[in-house]
């Protein structure tokens, strides 16, 4: 059993990034076991731990990725075009690989802003049940764009009732947030005009849901 204790003058932790002065992080076999004040280490049952001190430094145990799509791996050639022909099985394999890589890179929470086939909500449940490896996920389910909208991830919608239906299907799947693709992902740099592919009524419907 490998245990490492990291000590720093300040540690930010938890969902609200609470601050702890003179804190310590106890890691066991590559996983964070506990976060506690350094003075409490004497009462913590750890032996033969490797201690690393970072005086004058701040540690945040786990980075938060605020925007991702599990079905996209930007390291692959023509990664966006892959979405057009990849099936659910292929995208699931891609998501599992990416989730493990994210966790190993230091990401412990990721916000997924739309994925095909509800892969994000499926992965979230598998991770929570200990059946898959990855960071804690906040899932959006099916992203909604206009029927003439841009992008590869969002599902085309036309009218408030289609928006309402998808919102409710997403909520039934246990999403944490709803994602609207309102404007182009990459606006035209030569124009000051930014089009909206969803109407005010469609956006208002999603907000009301």
Model-derived features: where do they sit?
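N-terminal metal-binding scaffold of metallo-dependent hydrolase/deaminase domains
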Residues: 1-45, 59
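Divalent metal-dependent hydrolysis catalytic cores, especially in the metallo-beta-lactamase
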Residues: 94-119, 134-145, 175-189
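Short amphipathic alpha-helices and their capping/turn segments at secondary-structure boundaries
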Residues: 48-60, 120-131, 160-175
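Conserved beta-strand scaffold positions in the cores of enzyme catalytic domains, especially
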Residues: 5, 49-53, 139
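Active-site mouth loops of central-metabolism enzymes
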Residues: 80-93, 148-165
């Amino acid at each position: 059993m490998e245990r490492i204790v990291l000590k720093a003058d300040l540690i930010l932790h938890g969902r609200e990034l609470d601050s702890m002065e003179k804190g310590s992080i106890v890691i066991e076999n590559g996983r964070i076991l506990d976060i506690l004040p350094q003075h409490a280490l004497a009462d913590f049952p750890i032996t033969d731990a490797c201690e690393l001190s970072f005086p004058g430094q701040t540690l945040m145990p786990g980075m938060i990725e605020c925007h991702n799509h599990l079905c996209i791996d930007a390291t692959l050639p023509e990664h966006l075009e892959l979405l057009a022909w990849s099936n659910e099985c292929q995208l699931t394999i891609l998501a599992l690989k990416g989730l493990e890589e994210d966790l190993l890179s230091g990401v412990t929470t990721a916000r997924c802003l739309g994925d095909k086939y509800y892969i994000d909500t499926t992965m979230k449940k598998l991770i929570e049940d200990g059946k898959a490896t990855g960071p804690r996920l906040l899932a959006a389910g099916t992203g909604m764009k206009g029927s003439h909208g841009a992008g590869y991830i969002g599902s085309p919608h036309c009218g408030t009732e289609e928006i309402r239906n998808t919102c409710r299907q997403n909520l039934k799947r246990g999403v944490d947030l709803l994602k609207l693709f309102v404007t182009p992902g990459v606006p035209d740099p030569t124009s000051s005009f930014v089009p909206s592919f969803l109407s005010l009524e469609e956006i208002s419907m999603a907000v009301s849901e």
